């Protein structure tokens, strides 16, 4: 089988932005799922955003990695266009909130408690993030789209996969591990 992951790092995402998970959810489900998974044939795809500011697009078992890279370059443009069309964001908001506050068994309560403690994120900060997502302003999402575009202009791609997949991507430099 062919397996590859095609991430890029978005350096300009504001680490303190509370709505980056919402932007990631919109891009993953309304755009990448259709163009990389359904049309491109990858087994999975998405845009992941962490509280640290680390953000990447990925695909899994992707037979068209070169095309996926081209689709990733359009994430910011997609988000801008999607917001201009005034789509209802309610489903994305609910989905994002459910990911941020899942039902937890005692083991997970301890695990997340440790995670929040070591990341210095208290209940007040969590509540502020939930409220920011519930009361999101489309202009805030447009700022994230702008940050995606700015970062993509600067380049920086990391690909992990088979030699044939990587060779098809016509990269300037390939480092073998």
Roles of regions detected by a PLM:
Residues 47-104:
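M16/insulysin-pitrilysin zinc metalloprotease superfamily fold
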Residues 17-20, 64-70, 166-169:
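Short, conserved charged micro-motifs
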Residues 1-7, 37-54, 61-71, 109, ...:
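A glycine-rich, aromatic-flanked flexible loop/lid motif
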Residues 1-38, 177:
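His/Glu-based metal-binding/catalytic segments typifying zinc-dependent metallopeptidases
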Residues 13-15, 58-63, 161:
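Short beta-strand-to-loop capping motifs
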Residues 1, 14, 93-177:
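C-terminal regions of mature proteins
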